[in-house]
Amino acid sequence: MLAQKQKLAPIGINQKIDYKDIDLLKLFITEQGKILPRRATGVTVQQQRQLAKAIKRARILSLLPFVASNEL
């Protein structure tokens, strides 16, 4: 049998997820501005929900863009 590879959580268990922490939130969005899925980031279900809510709040407050610009 193959051993399953253990994913390291990018966020600590007790780390606070806040909409004002833009550097942390940018780790969980693509270049186009889409929220990365949980299977790609390795976070828990609760953390994914908190991240999605924080990213959406940051977008509404114009801290993060809804879509990325197409600058060449």
From Swiss-Prot:
One of its GO terms (molecular function) is structural constituent of ribosome. The keyword rRNA-binding applies. It is found in: Plastid, Chloroplast. Keywords: Chloroplast, Plastid, Ribonucleoprotein, Ribosomal protein, RNA-binding, rRNA-binding. Signal peptide: none annotated. PROSITE patterns: RIBOSOMAL_S18. One of its GO terms (biological process) is translation. Pfam families: Ribosomal_S18. Belongs to the bacterial ribosomal protein bS18 family. Part of the 30S ribosomal subunit. This is Small ribosomal subunit protein bS18c.
